[in-house]
Design a protein with these regions (language model features):
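Membrane-interface "cap" regions at the ends of multi-pass membrane proteins
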Residues: 2-57, 63-65, 80-85, 96-97
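Transmembrane helix-loop junctions and nearby membrane-interface residues
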Residues: 81, 131, 138-145, 194-197, ...
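Residue-level signal for short hydrophobic patches within transmembrane helices
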Residues: 38-47, 54, 58, 71, ...
Length: 334
């Protein structure tokens, strides 16, 4: 009986929740400086969304859905809208740091909160790696185009594997290339974040302006190459075909509007980042919903506009997987 009681006590601790009123009381203590406005929260969400996603997924998306990739982005944005409503309501209801971890703690218990918290840590950590590598590759391409080559030790990473990837003995770290530029980039961003919320928010606003400006430049410049005839075969692969009719493709390549919507959904990840700073915004009940929904709305409009211009300026069968936006503007010799 005593052992059963100990087990039940342990299980009770795992599923124990915290009172929402207690969490609200913590937010009123103002442990962190409340310095962010709705505009700052929207900027944080946009900064997290518009990263490597649109630049790396749209080429593959066009290959899988053709011009109908526009519908895939709309469908992914529509699906994200319901998740955004949940984040907006919960963030306004429990305006303290932690985002999904805090919401899980208040409703599902400690164990679920622990799982969600570490999932978020892994999500933000792992997703930062390809973005940092993309930045490193972009730096290398810019320097190469300017006639300034990087030394061998500073070039992008190259992991050498001999054999099966799941066997630790297959990895040849001695002959692998480490991405120094990506590592330095991550360290600089981490240092910037440690300066304080106001400083990091200001820097994020600058980066967001640069990202949006780059997309707007593409939209305006690409519009000069627009040809409506490129949209005649608008839905070449249907809504959910696994492979094109009568064709053979790689098993890992999704085809159709709905599968591609699931693929490009990666571009929308990040709008929830605004809720992680709930304890640092001036008026969370007002600012969090505006920030989350504003970030998602702006991101959706930019993604769809970019897809329309890309497909209007380039026949969809000619759109490459790598650097499709640069390829689309190549006739302008910018």
């Amino acid at each position: 009986m005593r052992e059963n009681g100990a087990v039940m006590s342990f299980v009770a601790r795992l599923i124990a929740t915290t009172n929402v009123d207690s969490l609200r009381a913590l937010s009123r203590n103002k442990v962190l400086k409340r310095a962010l406005s709705a505009r700052d929260l929207a900027s944080i969400g946009i900064g997290a969304m518009i990263g490597g996603g649109i630049f790396t997924t749209i080429g593959t998306g066009v290959k899988g859905a053709g011009p109908a990739v526009i519908l895939s982005y709309l469908l992914a944005g529509f699906t994200s809208f319901f998740a955004a409503l949940c984040y907006a309501e919960l963030g306004a209801m429990v305006p303290i740091a932690g985002s999904a971890y805090t919401y899980a703690y208040a409703t599902l218990g400690k164990l679920a909160a622990w799982i969600v918290g570490f999932a978020l840590i892994f999500e933000y950590g792992i997703s930062a790696a390809p973005v940092a590598q993309a930045f490193s590759a972009a730096v290398g391409d810019v320097l190469k185009s300017a006639g300034l080559g990087l030394p061998q030790w500073a070039q992008t990473s190259n992991l050498v594997i001999h054999g099966a990837w799941w066997q630790p003995s297959s990895y040849d770290f001695a002959h692998s290339q480490y991405d120094v530029i990506a590592a330095v980039f991550v360290l600089l961003i981490a240092g910037l974040l440690s300066l304080g919320i106001r400083e990091s928010a200001t820097a994020n606003n600058i980066f967001v302006v640069l990202k949006i400006s780059a997309l707007l430049v593409f939209i305006v410049a690409g519009a000069t190459l627009f040809h409506g005839a490129n949209f005649h075969d608008f839905i070449p692969h249907g809504w959910g075909a696994l492979v094109p009719f009568g064709g053979a493709v790689e098993a890992s390549q999704p085809y159709g509007i709905i599968p591609i919507a699931a693929f490009v959904f990666f571009s929308y990840i990040g709008f929830d980042a605004a809720t992680t700073t709930a304890e640092e915004c001036k008026n969370p009940q007002r600012d969090i919903p505006l920030g989350v929904l504003g970030a998602l709305g702006i991101g959706t409009v930019l993604y769809c506009a970019t897809a329309v211009v890309l497909l209007g300026s380039t026949p969809w069968r000619n759109v490459p997987d790598k650097n499709p936006l640069v390829y689309a503007l190549s006739p302008l010799h910018l």
